[in-house]
């Protein structure tokens, strides 16, 4: 038998950009588009993390046409093709190794004269014959008519022996990190040094009762749709239990 409160409940969609929050006390408040304020007894934060880009105009031009920030998402489309990965950390090395199992050739473009990745990841990269590491290289542009066909590179930028050349590729993968979209919640929730929301162990619970974090906003490691969906399910179950414990449903 459903309670009167449950019968009265309905789903309300509110589309817009969350621009502020007040989690100091329940009911919690979230401001949409800097004007509309939503009050809620419980909140699931699933704002994700945005991939960092180099800032090239061509990145937007070729988005979905050869430019990607997720090798495991889009790598399949580059089977037996030539791709480039930008970055020098663990993520970049992981992406390069993954793509090496699909692509004909992988170029790892590294701005510095060394890799920042862990020793074991560096060793994994070097074991793949179809991965070429381009140290001291900067990607400064992309080109192609109907998609990415190549990248403009500068070797030893700013040095007397600076060299500029073009490299033919089919795909351009960015692996220079992600920025969690947690700014409007940082005043109330614990985050790590990069901004990911810290939850209690494997649960989606944050330090604020009734506020939960799910998906990439609380996951700096996996960042996959299926893991985000799983954590979203856990957050929904926790939110229901919280509301029930407060006799709100």
What kind of feature is each model-predicted range?
Residues 227-243:
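An active-site-proximal "capping" alpha-helix that borders the catalytic cofactor pocket
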Residues 87-89:
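Glycine-rich Rossmann-fold phosphate-binding loop(s) that bind the pyrophosphate
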Residues 13-81, 157-162, 173, 197-201:
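FAD-binding core/adjacent interface of flavoenzyme oxidoreductases
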Residues 50, 55, 60-77, 176-222, ...:
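FAD-site-proximal beta/loop scaffold in flavoenzymes
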Residues 5, 91-143, 244-249:
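Rossmann-like dinucleotide-binding cores of NAD(P)H-dependent redox enzymes
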Residues 43, 151, 168-174:
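AMP-binding/adenylate-forming core of the ANL superfamily
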Residues 1-11:
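Single conserved hydrophobic/aromatic residue that forms the stacking wall/gate
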């Amino acid at each position: 038998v459903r309670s009167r409160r449950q019968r009265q409940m309905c789903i309300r969609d509110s589309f817009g950009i969350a621009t502020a929050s007040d989690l100091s006390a329940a009911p919690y408040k979230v401001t949409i588009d800097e004007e509309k304020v939503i009050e809620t007894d419980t909140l699931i934060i699933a704002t994700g993390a945005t991939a960092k880009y180099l800032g090239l105009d061509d990145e937007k031009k070729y988005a979905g046409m050869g430019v990607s920030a997720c090798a495991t998402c889009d790598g399949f489309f580059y089977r037996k093709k030539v791709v480039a990965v930008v970055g020098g950390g663990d993520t970049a090395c992981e992406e390069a190794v993954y793509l090496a199992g699909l692509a004909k050739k992988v170029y790892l473009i590294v701005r510095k004269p060394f890799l920042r990745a862990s020793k074991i990841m560096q060793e994994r990269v070097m074991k793949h014959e179809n991965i070429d590491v381009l140290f001291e290289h900067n990607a400064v542009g992309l080109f192609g008519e109907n998609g990415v066909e190549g990248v403009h590179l500068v070797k030893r930028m700013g040095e007397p022996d600076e060299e500029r050349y073009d490299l033919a590729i089919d795909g351009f993968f960015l692996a220079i990190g992600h920025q969690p979209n947690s700014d409007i919640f940082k005043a109330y929730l614990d985050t790590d040094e990069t901004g990911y929301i810290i939850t209690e162990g494997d649960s989606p619970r944050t330090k604020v009762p009734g506020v939960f974090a799910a998906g990439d906003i609380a996951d700096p490691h996996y960042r996959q749709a299926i893991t985000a969906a799983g954590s979203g399910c856990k957050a929904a179950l926790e939110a229901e239990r919280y509301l029930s414990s407060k006799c709100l449903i």
